[in-house]
Swiss-Prot record:
Mg(2+) binds at D34, T64. Pathway: Membrane lipid metabolism; glycerophospholipid metabolism. One of its GO terms (molecular function) is magnesium ion binding. This is Geranylgeranylglyceryl phosphate synthase. It comes from Saccharolobus islandicus (strain L.S.2.15 / Lassen #1) (Sulfolobus islandicus).
Length: 255
């Protein structure tokens, strides 16, 4: 069990925190918590404590449907005791809160709707400035199954086996100055991003890759890490079987 001190101030320092770890060749894990799917504060506290103690590197808070500002703030407040970053993973401009340590400032690059590429970002920018939130510019690219995120975001999903297209998107994100590329197979996807896609991309680009969607076992997570994934995100498995999520985190952090 990995016990860490609490109450380290992270506001304004989240990007540095992440980059320092990546520069030390650490492989990171983010725990994605959907406020809409959390049934009670006791459940959240139990889950968060276990994820934290085995070494998850950050809490991502967000969901595609049903998340109110009050529920978002409530969840972030319950996570306040833990020294790792609380990062908002927004689906729209309603998911902004000064209580968070940072915000993934996402652009859904393969959306057919300009709103999700740059429109929402323009609307959100003055609010983010007013709230003095730290932003982490991140290209969001949906692959394969895509799930609800692809449907809502009107994404032209990249086929699982189209490595060249995924690489082109990654290079475009790098040249646009993004800090990260988040390759998303979708919540509950029947298949995760393929390791072969990650290794293909890594031959062309050094931008850090966040990989999420369909990761249900430590074996799958380790294959993604070995292929070059820098950050693994799990969410659905946390909701369904926290013990499996714990095994995934242990595997990644002991790699």
């Amino acid at each position: 069990m990995k016990i860490r001190k609490k109450k380290m101030k992270l506001k304004g320092k989240v990007k540095k925190y992440l980059m320092d770890k990546l520069n030390d060749n650490e492989k990171l894990h983010f725990s994605l918590l959907d406020p809409f799917k959390i049934n009670s504060s006791e459940e959240l506290k139990y889950i968060a404590k276990n994820l934290y103690n085995v070494g998850t590197d950050a809490f991502l808070i967000g969901g595609t449907l049903g998340v109110s500002k009050d529920k978002l703030d409530f969840v972030i407040s319950l996570l306040d005791d833990y020294e790792i970053p609380k990062i908002i993973f927004p689906s729209n401009i309603n998911l902004l809160s000064e209580k968070a340590d940072a915000l993934l400032f996402l652009s859904l690059l393969n959306s057919d709707d300009i709103y999700y590429v740059i429109g929402a970002q323009i609307v959100a920018a003055p609010i983010i400035k007013m709230l003095q939130m730290e932003v982490i510019p991140t290209a969001y690219v949906i692959v394969g199954h895509g799930g609800t995120a692809a449907h809502i975001g009107k994404a032209r999903v990249i086929p699982y086996d189209n490595f060249e297209l995924a690489t082109a998107y990654t290079l475009a994100a790098e040249y646009l100055g993004m800090d990260f590329v988040y390759l998303e197979a979708g919540s509950g996807a029947p298949e995760p991003i393929r390791p072969e896609m990650i290794s293909f991309i890594k031959k062309a680009s050094s931008i850090p890759l966040i990989i999420g969607g369909g990761i249900r076992s430590v074996e799958v997570a380790l294959k993604l890490v070995e292929a070059g994934a820098n950050i693994i995100v799990t969410g659905n498995i946390i909701e369904r079987d926290v013990d499996k999520a714990i095994k995934i985190i242990r595997g990644i952090k002991n790699k």
